[in-house]
A protein has these predicted regions:
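Conserved GNAT acetyl-CoA-binding A-motif
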Residues: 138-147, 312-324
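A short, internal acetyl-CoA/4′-phosphopantetheine-binding micro-motif in the GNAT/acyltransferase core
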Residues: 107-120, 290-298
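A conserved beta-strand-loop-helix scaffold within acyl/acetyltransferase catalytic domains
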Residues: 1-93, 132-297
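Conserved acetyl-CoA-binding loop-helix of GNAT-fold acetyltransferases
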Residues: 94, 119-132, 295-310, 321
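Hydrophobic/aromatic ligand-binding patch that stacks against planar heteroaromatic rings
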Residues: 134, 311, 328
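Short glycine/proline-enriched loop/turn "hinge" motifs that connect secondary-structure elements
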Residues: 94-106, 279
Length: 353
């Protein structure tokens, strides 16, 4: 079996890559990964060097896996700073490291694409052997698989990788017919408070959901602007995604994108106030980014959670992943679920820790 290292996802055709993963999960689509690279969001300069893997058998591609060589731990949402600090304290280099993940995207999904009829255990054995060899070649301390589906951790990898468990809060669709049907499952006081929040959040404000081609260029420009403002306010940076990403993502994955938006309530259309960006597939909705140009009470909950729940019910989606963290989501019908990561540490003293 031959391994090929792709310095860019575009060294593999979109038809081949997407056929190996055979899923409508949006974040592993060739177009999404390609745009991260071509927009300058993911590149050497941002500390995400593409090293994607393609496995071939007798010249026929049979498996693929996203892989990055990284010199930091930002944009991962699985925190390993304590490991990095421990390495530093012992005078050992932790970076670079190898990461199999979707950059900036803590969303559970497939991480290895395998052609039909190929034994997954065989692919995992070959990948693990090659990862160890590549880590030595590139001086990488470790390999990290972030937010894989649970099955991946119970096969070959369970013998060589450490598993870590985290918690997110997801909403599950129990065949609700509409939002009222959903809130009817709440205790009376809880339901009353939530509906009061919704009314308060839309006083003098129009809230809408836009899908695909309904999202105009000016809304993409606004989403980009408030995304950067949100990060600037939070940590003094402009965030991970560039303006070009927002300019082009609608053309790349438009049919799998929903934007919930808020405007001032005025005849002829008011000023844009806030927006939240979601992706979706046949099974779930994934809330990713939010931003606003002023503070409005409860508007974040309306655009990021309630609009997402309504959309999921309308589309008959099974679940809604509204993003990392947030125990406050429980009061809005979200439940805690386990999320996973797996880690191979080359240094024996640390791998046994």
């Amino acid at each position: 079996m031959k391994i090929k290292i792709l310095q860019s996802i575009d060294e593999c055709s979109s038809k081949l890559w997407d056929s190996l993963f055979s899923t409508d999960y949006p974040f592993l689509k060739h177009g999404f990964i390609s745009l991260l690279e071509s927009s300058g969001s993911v590149c050497d300069a941002t500390g995400w060097t593409p090293k994607h893997i393609l496995l071939e058998q007798e010249g026929v591609p049979i498996a693929a896996m996203p892989l990055y060589l990284k010199n930091h731990s930002s944009g991962e949402y699985v925190f390993d700073h304590s490991w990095a600090n421990a390495y530093h304290q012992h005078g050992i280099q932790y970076y670079p490291k190898l990461v199999t993940a979707i950059p900036f995207t803590p969303v559970t999904g497939p991480r290895i694409g395998i052609a039909n009829g190929i034994n997954p255990d065989l692919i995992e054995q070959v990948l693990l052997k090659n990862i160890k060899s590549l880590a030595k070649k590139w001086g990488a301390s470790s390999w990290h698989i972030l937010f894989p589906r649970y099955r991946l951790l119970n096969g070959v990898f369970s013998q060589s990788l450490m598993k870590r468990v985290g918690v997110q809060y997801h909403w599950n669709n129990h065949n609700y017919s509409n939002f009222d049907d959903f809130t009817n499952t709440f205790a009376s006081r809880k339901r009353k408070n939530l509906l009061k929040e919704r009314r308060k959040s839309t006083e003098n404000i129009n809230v809408n959901r836009l899908v695909g081609e309904e999202i105009t260029a000016d809304w993409w420009e606004f989403m980009c602007s408030v995304y950067h403002q949100t990060y600037l306010k939070r940590n003094g940076t402009h965030g991970y995604l560039t303006q070009k990403f927002f300019e082009d993502i609608g053309n790349v994955l438009g049919s799998q994108i929903m934007l919930s938006v808020a405007e001032e309530k005025r005849s002829g259309g008011g000023e844009k106030i806030a927006s939240a960006l979601f992706f979706f597939d046949d099974n779930g909705l994934y809330g990713r980014y939010w931003g606003c140009n002023a503070e409005y009470e409860f508007l974040h909950f309306e655009l990021c959670y309630h609009q997402g729940i309504e959309f999921s019910i309308e589309k008959n989606l099974s679940y809604f992943d509204a993003g990392a963290q947030g125990e406050h989501k429980i009061s809005r019908g979200f439940v805690p679920i386990e999320v996973y990561s797996a880690h191979w540490i080359e240094h024996p003293d640390f791998s046994d820790a």
